[in-house]
């Protein structure tokens, strides 16, 4: 039969009646021990050798143990000094005995704590008494130290344990594997065993010389764990944003971009939000102090927006019975929603004039001064989308959103009529969580009001919707705390291990 | 969104739906878009609904809506009113609160529940339409305690009250929940309710006050006098509202009158005598919106017969009269949310039930696509990931300390990242006071947060940065920035430059790195990133002071430059 070289060497070196240790075989064959161990295990698997394991215990002296083997154990030295001072007759003052014994430093405590334990005498109120019957010549611990110094082994486990607890010896266990040739091994050897040419690594030289064709490659343990590797990785929330973008582009939506800091005019007034609406003075908005006001607003647009707020739209429309002040509209803030981009696009301020039919979207940041918790951050990604066409109906809105959400595994969408200052009709969108089955709100939608569209000079109907990307990601992946993901408190380990969104 | 507590038994009694159990009631309420949020300790329903239907802020209003929804009532209902006996004479009112309205209510029978409901309605109207009493404030009084002098015999009103403005210390009265005579000014500093609403009158030279023959009895928008306090024994009420807008207070007044009418009371007109005109209130005038039949069909996506539209309107509590091309739809006075014919269409859709509509995908063809800048951003992010970087997503808001101080930088340095930041006016937290002017500080913060994780930590971000710049339209220059750090035992300038070079090669731009100095980097190990000959950013080994400041124990090399330089 053919076997790898190192296995042949092991077979040749092994015998049927004399178990050979791996280290001995390694020395005989000039291979490293780990190679021989691997070869022996491979041969054992073939039944050609038997591998036996025995565990041996080695006891070796520590530096402190060596010192006591030479100088005597501190408690024995104390006892001898005590006898010299006559403590076997009457207790003597401890300090002088310690001095006479030549003990200092930590040895003093060691001597005192072992003195009584081993029956050399008693210590009471600083006075030392010695037991005249104690036998320091036969102290088992001292004997064991001497034995170990001579290179012999100590059989009394209790004494070894005691010495180990005093840090005078270290006890180590070692597993020794020994190899014996089996009957089958003998048979194969008799039949003849040849060595194959086996290499550990494929090298450029092997490839260049063509030798690779004549060699065997050593087997690896392919089931073993490999070292950790940290790949470059797209942020999981960004992956979700890309996924949403893919879906929307596929549905014919064109991307919008625009300023994060914008005038309230575009964030609120163009959306027919009355200036005394609680949300506009509320602390949940991030107003800017520097810069605080936008300089330029399109005069004609401002005038039309103001008129819509005051008078409404159409022949018998009503406006808000609320104050409207252009200066208030000039206040700059971080956009609370990306619907400000929609306003700018519909007004023709972003691109060329937008004309029906058109679909637009953005997946971008909005800012809300909310309480931070597992589902709320001060910054979040808003998915904003809208469709401009002639004669859009509520049914078209429902069909569009049903299609969008079904791309994310959310079916049986439900529409709850709701109120929103700039849409009518308006709907909250509810869907079932794919895993928990719970009915949860997953977006807000509606058809823009004439009071919004007329001033922007839009010809046609516009239906729009928005939702937080984070909410969608939570639905898609089931992760629970947004703070692990987004922002400078993010956990790099969490991001490294986050499952890919596709 | 407003939350109102409603006694389900009251709701059963007022709707006449006496046999419905709590579950059925909850289901009916959901059909109106009113969400059940739980129960109070007394077993009342806590109901949450949208801020448009303020006529539903009371059990009476909700009962009315439920009766329409169930088909028990149809069309517009206007309560009969009796001719006025009382007048409100308006003289020398405060300039900032010039409007008043009111009504007299006779034959009320207020048990404790009904009184609670009335007080709750008043509070909820204050909180919503009344804009915390600034825009409209309601006072309700026991009419029996008022004494009006007899006016001339022209038959319009025999008794009159006066709404006027007085000196803050010009008179005294005993306010509700109090025993002492106080001036209005004293009320604002000495009475708990006065303290709450003192801000509303901060700019007033004279304070609003309502007088009868006996004297001052109401100090709107703050508090009523104790003399006219309403109790369960009150049988006749005087309702007055003051505010900054006549329409608003008239609508609030109508909502209150409708609630009391639902409990069997009789509404009596009040004359409001302004110096230049005379109004009869409450204003129960019906408004009309013209809605085209075509608009109803196109907006709802359903074909209707004329009869069907009229039926839906009546079930929404409206009245629709067919015209040539549509309908004249009458809107009852308690509806404050109907501004435009689309609001009528929404009502029709709700009466029809939107969830009975069949969704359809619109037959509208458009071409989708991304912006160029978004495509570039995605490509750079992918290239960075290919170079082994972990893509990060940090906050755009940060603090001066993080953005500047901890990076050894000031806004006045001549260095990448140094600029006047866009500043948040009233920061919620010290951690978020400005928009970041560059992104490297964010990456340093992430390194700081993650010192317990294995190195190397090679982090990158393609993100937003901004600074104040008067030459831009909004006064803020916003841009996309590319930032990266390499944190590891042997991180060096060369490691950072090798990756930057690879990135520039991928985008076919020429990179040069002439030496520079930057407070965040080690002198002699920092360079300007010049892309195609233009300065675009900075690269180098982070200054040990910056590294130690962030509790990081390994060297860090990094770079940051403007995304647009790769175009």
UniProtKB/Swiss-Prot annotation, chain A:
Protein location: Cytoplasm
Cross-referenced Pfam families: tRNA-synt_2d
GO biological process terms on file: phenylalanyl-tRNA aminoacylation
Main localization (coarse): cytoplasm
Cofactor(s) demanded: Mg(2+)
Top-level taxon in the UniProt lineage: Archaea
Reactions mediated catalytically: tRNA(Phe) + L-phenylalanine + ATP = L-phenylalanyl-tRNA(Phe) + AMP + diphosphate + H(+)
CDD domains, alphabetized: PheRS_alpha_core (cd00496)
Top EC class, one word: ligase
EC number(s) reported in the record: 6.1.1.20
This protein's GO CC annotations: cytoplasm
Gene3D superfamilies listed in its UniProt record: Bira Bifunctional Protein, Domain 2, Winged helix-like DNA-binding domain superfamily/Winged helix DNA-binding domain
Signal sequence bounds: none
GO molecular function: ATP binding; magnesium ion binding; phenylalanine-tRNA ligase activity; tRNA binding
Record key words, sorted: Aminoacyl-tRNA synthetase, ATP-binding, Cytoplasm, Ligase, Magnesium, Metal-binding, Nucleotide-binding, Protein biosynthesis
Cofactor note: Binds 2 magnesium ions per tetramer.
Amino-acid positions noted as binding Mg(2+) in the UniProt annotation, renumbered to this chain: 424
Chain sites annotated for binding L-phenylalanine: 339, 382-384, 422, 448
Subunit organization: Tetramer of two alpha and two beta subunits.
NCBIfam families listed in its UniProt record: pheS (TIGR00468), PRK04172.1 (NF003210)
Family per similarity comment: Belongs to the class-II aminoacyl-tRNA synthetase family. Phe-tRNA synthetase alpha subunit type 2 subfamily.
Protein name: Phenylalanine--tRNA ligase alpha subunit
Lineage: Archaea, Methanobacteriati, Methanobacteriota, Stenosarchaea group, Halobacteria
Gene coding for it: pheS
From Swiss-Prot, chain B:
Record EC number: 6.1.1.20
PROSITE patterns: B5
Positions with a binding annotation for Mg(2+): 337, 343, 346-347
Biological processes annotated in GO: phenylalanyl-tRNA aminoacylation
InterPro entries for this protein: aa-tRNA-synth_II/BPL/LPL, B3/B4_tRNA-bd, DNA-bd_dom_put_sf, Phe-tRNA-ligase_IIc_bsu, Phe-tRNA-synth_IIc_bsu_arc_euk, Phe-tRNA_synthase-like_B3/B4, Phe_tRNA_ligase_beta2_arc, PheRS_beta_core
Cited SMART domains: B3_4, B5
SUPFAM superfamilies: Class II aaRS and biotin synthetases, Putative DNA-binding domain
Signal peptide location: none
Residues in B5 domain copies: 284-359
A GO molecular function held by the record: magnesium ion binding
Record has Phosphoprotein as a keyword: no
Protein keywords: Aminoacyl-tRNA synthetase, ATP-binding, Cytoplasm, Ligase, Magnesium, Metal-binding, Nucleotide-binding, Protein biosynthesis
Keyword Magnesium: yes
Co-factor requirement: Mg(2+)
Catalysis: reaction(s): tRNA(Phe) + L-phenylalanine + ATP = L-phenylalanyl-tRNA(Phe) + AMP + diphosphate + H(+)
Cell compartment(s), UniProt: Cytoplasm
Gene Ontology CC, one term: phenylalanine-tRNA ligase complex
PANTHER family named in the record: PHENYLALANINE--TRNA LIGASE BETA SUBUNIT (PTHR10947:SF0), PHENYLALANYL-TRNA SYNTHETASE BETA CHAIN AND LEUCINE-RICH REPEAT-CONTAINING PROTEIN 47 (PTHR10947)
Family membership noted in the UniProt record: Belongs to the phenylalanyl-tRNA synthetase beta subunit family. Type 2 subfamily.
Quaternary structure note: Tetramer of two alpha and two beta subunits.
NCBIfam families in alphabetical order: pheT_arch
UniProt name for this protein: Phenylalanine--tRNA ligase beta subunit
Species: Halobacterium salinarum (strain ATCC 700922 / JCM 11081 / NRC-1)
Gene: pheT
């Amino acid at each position: 039969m053919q076997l790898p070289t190192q296995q042949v060497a092991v077979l040749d070196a092994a015998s049927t009646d004399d178990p050979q240790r791996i280290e001995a075989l390694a020395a005989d064959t000039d291979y490293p021990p780990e190679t021989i161990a691997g070869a022996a295990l491979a041969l054992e698997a073939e039944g050609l050798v038997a591998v036996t394991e025995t565990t041996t215990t080695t006891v070796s002296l520590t530096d402190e143990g060596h010192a006591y083997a030479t100088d005597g154990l501190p408690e024995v030295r104390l006892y001898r000094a005590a006898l010299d001072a006559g403590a076997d007759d009457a207790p003597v003052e401890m300090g002088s005995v310690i001095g006479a014994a030549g003990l200092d430093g930590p040895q003093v405590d060691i001597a005192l704590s072992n003195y009584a334990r081993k029956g050399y005498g008693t210590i009471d109120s600083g006075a030392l008494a010695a037991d005249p019957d104690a036998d320091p010549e036969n102290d088992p611990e001292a004997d064991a130290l001497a034995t170990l110094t001579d290179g012999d082994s100590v059989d009394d486990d209790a004494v070894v344990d005691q010495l180990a607890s005093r840090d005078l010896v270290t006890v180590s266990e070692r597993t020794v594997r020994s190899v014996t040739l089996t009957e089958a091994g003998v048979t194969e050897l008799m039949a003849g065993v040849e060595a194959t040419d086996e290499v550990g690594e494929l090298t450029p030289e092997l490839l260049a010389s063509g030798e690779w064709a004549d060699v065997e490659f050593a087997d690896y343990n392919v089931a073993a764990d490999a070292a950790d590797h940290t790949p470059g990785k797209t942020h999981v929330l960004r992956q979700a944003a890309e996924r949403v973008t893919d879906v929307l582009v596929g549905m014919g939506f064109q991307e919008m971009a625009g300023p994060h800091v914008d005038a309230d005019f575009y964030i609120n007034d163009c959306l027919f939000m009355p200036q005394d609406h609680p949300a506009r003075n509320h602390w949940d908005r991030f107003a800017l102090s520097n810069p605080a006001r936008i300089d330029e607003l399109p005069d004609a647009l401002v005038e039309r927006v103001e008129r819509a707020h005051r008078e409404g739209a159409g022949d018998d429309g009503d406006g808000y019975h609320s104050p409207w002040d252009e200066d208030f509209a000039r206040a700059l803030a971080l956009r609370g929603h990306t619907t400000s981009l929609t306003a700018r696009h519909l007004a023709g301020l972003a691109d060329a004039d937008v004309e029906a039919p058109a679909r637009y979207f953005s997946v971008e940041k909005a800012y809300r001064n909310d309480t931070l918790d597992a589902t709320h951050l001060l910054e979040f990604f808003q998915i904003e989308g809208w469709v401009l066409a002639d004669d859009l109906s509520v049914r078209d809105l429902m069909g569009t959103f049903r299609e969008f959400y079904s791309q994310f595994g959310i079916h049986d969408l439900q529409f709850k009529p709701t109120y929103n200052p700039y849409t009518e009709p308006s709907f909250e969108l509810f869907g079932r969580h794919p895993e928990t089955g719970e009915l949860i709100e997953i977006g807000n939608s509606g058809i823009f009001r004439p009071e919004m569209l007329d001033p922007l000079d839009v010809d046609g109907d516009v239906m729009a919707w928005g939702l937080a990307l984070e909410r969608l990601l939570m639905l898609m992946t089931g992760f629970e705390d947004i703070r692990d993901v987004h922002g400078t408190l993010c956990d790099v380990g969490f991001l490294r291990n986050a499952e890919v969104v596709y | 969104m407003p939350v109102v507590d409603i006694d389900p038994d009251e709701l059963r009694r007022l709707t006449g739906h006496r046999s419905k159990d709590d579950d059925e009631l909850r289901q009916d309420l959901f059909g109106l878009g009113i969400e059940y949020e739980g129960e109070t300790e007394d077993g009342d329903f806590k109901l949450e609904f949208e801020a448009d239907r303020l006529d539903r802020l009371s059990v009476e209003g909700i009962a009315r809506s439920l009766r329409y929804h169930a088909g028990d009532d149809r069309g517009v209902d206007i309560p009969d009113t009796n001719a006025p006996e009382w007048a409100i004479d308006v003289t020398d009112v405060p300039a900032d609160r010039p409007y008043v309205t009111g009504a007299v209510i006779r034959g009320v029978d207020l048990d404790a529940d009904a009184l609670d409901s009335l007080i709750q309605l008043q509070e909820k109207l204050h909180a919503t339409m009344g804009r915390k009493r600034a825009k409209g404030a309601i006072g309700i009084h026991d009419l029996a305690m008022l004494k009006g002098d007899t006016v001339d015999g022209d038959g319009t009103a025999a008794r009159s009250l006066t709404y006027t403005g007085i000196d803050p210390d010009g008179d005294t009265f005993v306010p509700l929940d109090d025993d002492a005579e106080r001036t209005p000014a004293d009320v604002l500093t000495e009475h708990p309710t006065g303290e709450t609403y003192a801000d509303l009158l901060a700019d007033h030279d004279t304070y609003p006050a309502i007088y009868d023959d006996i004297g001052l009895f109401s100090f709107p928008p703050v508090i009523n006098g104790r003399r006219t306090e309403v109790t369960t024994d009150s049988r006749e009420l005087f309702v007055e509202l003051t505010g900054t807008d006549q329409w608003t207070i008239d609508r609030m007044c109508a909502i209150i009158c409708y609630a009391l009418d639902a409990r069997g009371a009789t509404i009596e007109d009040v004359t409001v005598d302004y110096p230049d005109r005379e109004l009869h209130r409450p204003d129960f005038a019906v408004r009309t919106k013209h809605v085209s039949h075509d608009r109803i069909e196109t907006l709802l996506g359903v074909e209707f017969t004329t009869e069907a539209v009229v039926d839906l309107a009546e079930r929404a509590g409206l009245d629709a009269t067919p015209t040539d091309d549509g309908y004249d739809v009458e809107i009852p006075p308690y509806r404050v949310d109907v501004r435009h014919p689309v609001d009528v269409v929404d009502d029709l859709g709700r009466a029809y039930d939107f969830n009975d509509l069949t969704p359809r995908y619109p037959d509208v063809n458009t071409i989708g696509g991304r912006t160029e800048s978004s495509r570039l951003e995605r490509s750079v992010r992918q290239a960075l990931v290919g170079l082994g970087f972990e893509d990060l997503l940090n906050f755009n808001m940060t603090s001066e300390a993080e953005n500047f101080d901890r990076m050894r930088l000031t806004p006045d340095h001549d260095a990448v990242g140094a600029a006047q930041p866009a500043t948040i006016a009233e920061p919620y937290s010290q951690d978020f006071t400005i928009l970041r002017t560059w992104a490297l500080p964010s990456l340093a913060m992430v390194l700081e947060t993650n010192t317990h994780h294995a190195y190397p930590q090679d982090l990158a971000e393609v993100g937003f940065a901004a600074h104040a710049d008067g030459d831009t339209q909004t006064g803020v220059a916003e841009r996309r920035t590319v930032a990266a750090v390499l944190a590891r035992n042997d991180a060096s300038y060369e490691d950072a430059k090798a990756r930057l070079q690879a990135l520039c090669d991928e985008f076919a731009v020429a990179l040069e790195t002439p030496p520079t100095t930057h407070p965040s980097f080690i002198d002699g190990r920092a360079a300007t990133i010049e892309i195609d000959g233009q300065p675009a950013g900075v690269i180098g080994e982070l200054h040990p002071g910056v590294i130690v400041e962030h509790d990081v124990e390994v060297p860090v090399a990094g770079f940051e430059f403007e995304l647009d330089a790769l175009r």
